[in-house]
Amino acid sequence: MYLSRTELDPARRSTMIALTSPQKFHGAVENSFSGERRRRLWRLDSLNGKLYLLLLSEELPDLTGLCAQFGTGAAPETRRYEPLLERVTSGSCWQFRLTANPTRARKDPADPLARGALKPCYLEAEQEQWLLEQAGKHGFALTEGAFQVTRKQTCHFRKNGKRPVTLLAVTYEGILQVTDPEAFREMLCQGIGRGKAYGLGLMTILHGGRSHG
């Protein structure tokens, strides 16, 4: 697998438009590959005052088009992902960042037997609880106080120019501890939660930190 980073130019009109419509970035990401369509994870990230698009993919991407459309002219960076995955061991602690779409099933009081419809978690307490629940499913542990919500954004756009879509994007940062390396590696590669086509679900990790509790 490959993890790529492309610096974006937020002053360009094309980038401004894409920042309000993730469908634009999704299309550019898909056009970076030839052949069969596969799941790719991507995310917008800010670091030291610069804006980047991170991309995790099975195949080596051709980022020429994406750079031409949204970039600053700086060459993109790409590296193999396997060396990081190999460092994931049971009990290891990592700093993490995740932008995800936390949702919860809400039952209809008029039909209590029906499966509840998935609705966004707008309350911060619910957003934190969602991540705590996801941790148990994906091979890592969190404790309250070891992570926080650092950003929230609601994005409205039309899918394929037709159906209206509303996505809640919540960014989490903190320290986690790996409890099941295999499940954790799978989550890193496959993503977490909904909205993956629109820049959600990619967790990035940096070795460091220590367990809380």
Task: Locate predicted features.
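RNA-interacting cores
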Residues: 1-213
